[in-house]
A protein has these predicted regions:
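Short glycine/serine- and small hydrophobic-enriched flexible loop segments
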Residues: 105-110, 160-170, 229-233, 295-299, ...
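Substrate-binding cleft of extracellular glycoside hydrolase catalytic domains
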Residues: 129, 133-187
Length: 394
């Protein structure tokens, strides 16, 4: 399934979160940014969760060591990480992309596997960092020459790789990781985040093809590219940018970009005018990308019950396994994501928002899943270990 629309190439139990936690979250993020300005990229503990659910999140979560299931990591590495360090998207023609490389680097840090981290990072540098800036080309195709035909970036991949480098610098004390993290984070802040428009800052999905100058309905954004747990960490690498403000703009969009009877966001959202609306030229669906929004909220420990409500409502009413892809205009499923790894996302969201213990299947990744559900499952495991150990019965 192609989760990256080809349009890039053309242009491109109850009351766990109180209503007041969002304000507390904003303050926590601001304090995190101030701390980062005082000591850029020095080792230290990540900021406290911006909103503290009754699931009792860890007060000082660390990514390093958060993936405690060594067997699950070995199986994932054997299936999806080549000897050279290429993370293979098994359901997408065997391509690789900046998203997958970033996820692989994060999981390697979480597993304490520096050797694999180095392999993935080395392949990423050699094959995706081929632009004239510090951002990454978004897609590498093994059966094409050149393998990178589209030099546009994907901002979620840029953010994930920069975040992984920040975590690696803290975990292993390598100044090279610190330097690389800063280079990428600075270009994200300068080139991809619209900070000075007189409106809340926006994260463009890529450098080309999404701005108001390039699209009649622009700017167009993708809320799943707001990788909320990354932003306080990027403040360590590039403290001159207001990452806390970017977090707040994303939280506001999660509340305002809700469409149709199910009140769900679409993958691609037009922010032209006073109100968000589904972007032109893309299916108006809540789908593969958008299912990550509650993952990132929960991982960051932010949001109120209202932020999680439409996702929990959708996933709590399922009459079959898997997650639905929803036509937002009609509020009906048009497809189902059947592989078991996807079920980790509702479990993590219910844990974060309601304190619901995760089911036994949450801790049992399946061996034969494709790259995307397998990756989301391990990310959810790491997030739960970092912030919601009480939901794991620990």
């Amino acid at each position: 399934v192609n989760r990256r629309p080809l349009a890039r190439a053309a242009a491109r139990r109850p009351g766990a979160l109180s209503a007041g936690t969002l304000a507390a979250g904003a303050l926590a993020l601001l304090l995190a940014g101030a701390s980062a300005r005082a000591a850029p990229l020095s080792p230290g503990t990540p900021p406290e969760p911006a909103a503290a659910p009754k699931a009792a999140p860890d007060a000082a979560p660390r990514l390093a060591g958060a993936l405690t299931d060594a067997g699950a990591w070995r199986a994932y590495r054997a299936r999806f990480v080549s000897e050279a360090g290429r993370v293979v998207d098994s359901a997408n023609g065997g391509i690789s992309h900046s998203e997958g490389q970033g996820y692989g680097m994060l999981l390697a840090v979480a597993a304490g596997d520096r050797g694999t981290f180095e392999r993935i990072w080395g392949w990423t540098r050699a094959n995706l960092m081929v632009r004239g800036d510090a951002l990454l080309a978004w897609r590498w195709e093994p059966d094409k020459r050149p393998a990178v035909a589209d030099l546009n970036d994907a901002s979620d991949g840029d953010v994930l790789v920069a975040w992984a480098l920040v975590e690696a610098a803290e975990a292993w004390g390598d100044p090279g990781y610190r330097i690389a993290a800063r280079r990428i984070a600075v270009d994200i802040g300068r080139r991809l985040v619209l900070f000075k428009t007189g409106k809340p800052p926006l994260l463009l999905p890529g450098l080309a093809g999404f701005s108001a100058e390039e699209r009649a309905d622009g700017p167009v954004v993708n809320l799943s590219y707001w990788v909320f747990p990354a932003f306080p960490r990027l403040a360590l690498a590039a403290p001159e940018f207001d990452w806390a403000r970017l977090t707040r703009s994303g939280l506001d969009l999660v509340l305002s970009a809700r469409f149709g009877p199910a009140r769900l966001p679409t993958e691609w959202i037009s922010l032209k005018g006073d109100e968000p609306r589904p972007a032109d030229g893309f299916p108006a669906q809540f789908s593969y990308n958008a299912i990550r929004i509650p993952l990132y909220l929960a991982w960051a420990g932010i949001g109120t019950p209202a932020h999680y409500a439409p996702f929990l409502a959708l996933w709590g009413e399922r009459e079959r396994g898997g997650l639905p892809v929803v036509d937002v205009a009609e509020g009906r499923p048009v497809e189902w994501l059947e592989e078991g790894g996807y079920a980790a996302l509702p479990a993590l969201a219910a844990c974060a928002a309601e304190g619901t213990p995760v089911p036994a299947s949450f801790g049992a990744p399946q061996a034969r899943e494709n790259y995307y559900p397998a990756t989301l499952h391990l990310l959810a495991l790491a997030a739960a270990q970092m912030r919601y150990a009480s939901c794991l019965g620990r």
